[in-house]
Regions:
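Extracellular/periplasmic catalytic domains that process cell-envelope and extracellular macromolecules
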Residues: 16-17, 76-78, 105
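Short, charged/polar surface micro-motifs in flexible loops or helix N-caps
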Residues: 17-18, 30-31, 39, 85-93
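The catalytic Nudix box helix
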Residues: 33-67
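Active-site-adjacent beta-strand/loop module that shapes the phosphate/pyrophosphate-binding cleft
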Residues: 5, 69-97, 110, 132-136
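N-terminal strand-loop-strand
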Residues: 1-34, 45
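Residues immediately flanking
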Residues: 27, 88, 114
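NUDIX/MutT-family hydrolases
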Residues: 95-132
Length: 139
């Protein structure tokens, strides 16, 4: 039996006086964290770094919690997404043009509070968001 399709990405956050803000990307009507499929021979952390750079232009990320991650339950044709925590101080994001699509992969981005992210993200990402909030807030 074939295993799950592996994807990897990052919960990108920045610290503000009002608490952490999480980078969300919208493609059509769906909000998500930056992520993509793991290439053959690529480890998942390298995939996460590559996908964040491809989808947001961010390359100055710090991974303050190292290789700690959370995964989604299988969804959409047995895909499992692994997320790492990545910190940035950058506020403005550029949505680069995808060479395959000839346009940006996403339509907009938003820096969201925990409550805003909880409302915008699909239910499958709730455990990932909650883990990020607990970890980043230190509780």
């Amino acid at each position: 039996m074939k295993g799950p399709v592996k994807a990897a990405g990052a919960v990108v956050f920045r610290r503000t006086p009002r608490g952490p803000r999480y980078l969300l990307l919208r493609a059509f009507k769906n909000w998500d964290f930056p992520k993509g499929l793991v290439d053959t021979g690529e480890n998942q952390l390298d995939c996460a770094r590559r996908e964040v750079a491809e989808e947001t232009g961010l390359t100055d990320l710090d991974y303050p919690f190292g290789e700690e991650f959370r995964e989604t339950l299988p969804y959409a044709a047995n895909k499992v997404a692994r997320y790492y925590l990545a910190e940035t101080e950058q506020v403005e994001i550029v949505l680069p043009i995808s060479p395959e699509l000839g346009r940006p992969e996403h339509h907009e981005y938003r820096w969201a509070s925990f409550d805003e992210a909880e409302e915008l993200l699909p239910p499958r990402l709730a455990p990932v968001l909650e883990w990020a909030q607990r970890t980043v807030s230190g509780s």
